[in-house]
Structure formats: structure tokens, C-alpha cells
């Protein structure tokens, strides 16, 4: 079975963000604005994205 993948791009900084939002970005592997990562599309990743949806842009790969 082929798992779908998501490309996650950080578009806003973490200044003023809550602690759990910063930790979610770090868990996703994002540290800088315009940095992107590719992750599997699963429930854990979707939950992290939901926490920081206003700081990132998500595309299906």
C-alpha cells in the first residue's frame, strides 16, 4: 500500500506562538521560515498540522 505524503512549508515565525505550537513545529522538523519537509499523511502528522495550521502551508505530494 502506498502512503500519501504531505509537503509542509513553514510560512510564519514562532515569535508570539504558544509553547505547544513551537514544539509541534519542532516535532515536524521545521525551524525556519520557508523551510519545508515531507512527512507521511497519518493521524499523528495531521494532528501536529492542526495545531500550527496558521503557521504552515500543506500540499499533497
Swiss-Prot record:
Family: Belongs to the universal ribosomal protein uL30 family.
Gene Ontology CC, one term: cytosolic large ribosomal subunit
Example of a GO biological process term: translation
Biological classification of the source: Bacteria, Bacillati, Actinomycetota, Actinomycetes, Mycobacteriales
Molecular function via GO: structural constituent of ribosome
Assembly mode: Part of the 50S ribosomal subunit.
SUPFAM superfamilies (UniProt xref): Ribosomal protein L30p/L7e
UniProt keyword annotations, A-Z: Ribonucleoprotein, Ribosomal protein
A Pfam family that the UniProt record links to this protein: Ribosomal_L30
Protein name as it appears in the record: Large ribosomal subunit protein uL30
Domain of life: Bacteria
UniProt xrefs under NCBIfam families: rpmD_bact (TIGR01308)
PROSITE patterns linked: RIBOSOMAL_L30
Keyword Ribosomal protein: yes
